[in-house]
Swiss-Prot record:
PANTHER family: HISTIDINE BIOSYNTHESIS BIFUNCTIONAL PROTEIN, HISTIDINE BIOSYNTHESIS BIFUNCTIONAL PROTEIN HIS7. Belongs to the PRA-PH family. GO terms for molecular function: ATP binding; phosphoribosyl-ATP diphosphatase activity. Keywords: Amino-acid biosynthesis, ATP-binding, Cytoplasm, Histidine biosynthesis, Hydrolase, Nucleotide-binding. Transmembrane segments: none annotated. This is Phosphoribosyl-ATP pyrophosphatase. One of its GO terms (cellular component) is cytoplasm. Gene3D superfamilies: MazG-like. It catalyses: 1-(5-phospho-beta-D-ribosyl)-ATP + H2O = 1-(5-phospho-beta-D-ribosyl)-5'-AMP + diphosphate + H(+).
Amino acid sequence: MSQRLTDVLQRLAATIEARKGGDPSVSYTAKLLNDPALAAKKLGEEAVETVIAAVAQGSDALAAESADLLYHWLALMAASGVSLDAVAEKLEAREGTSGIAEKASRA
């Protein structure tokens, strides 16, 4: 992953966090943060749109939908109170483990 993407995602996550407590009537992000179920629904919609872009719309559409997907994922994590460090911890625990073995360990 490029440092550029890391930096952009960190800024976006900080912006989302700053919207907590904001007015949902004027901030889409605040609206998502106030309603984790809505944030989850929007993430699902963006996931489907990302898949469609990947198989039928080309690389520019895939990049645009991926940006929407990442934004909505970050919003859902914030709305649900799950830190990105918690996600990093899970990913680190899986490093070096075969995907099949790792998945079996969660069953």
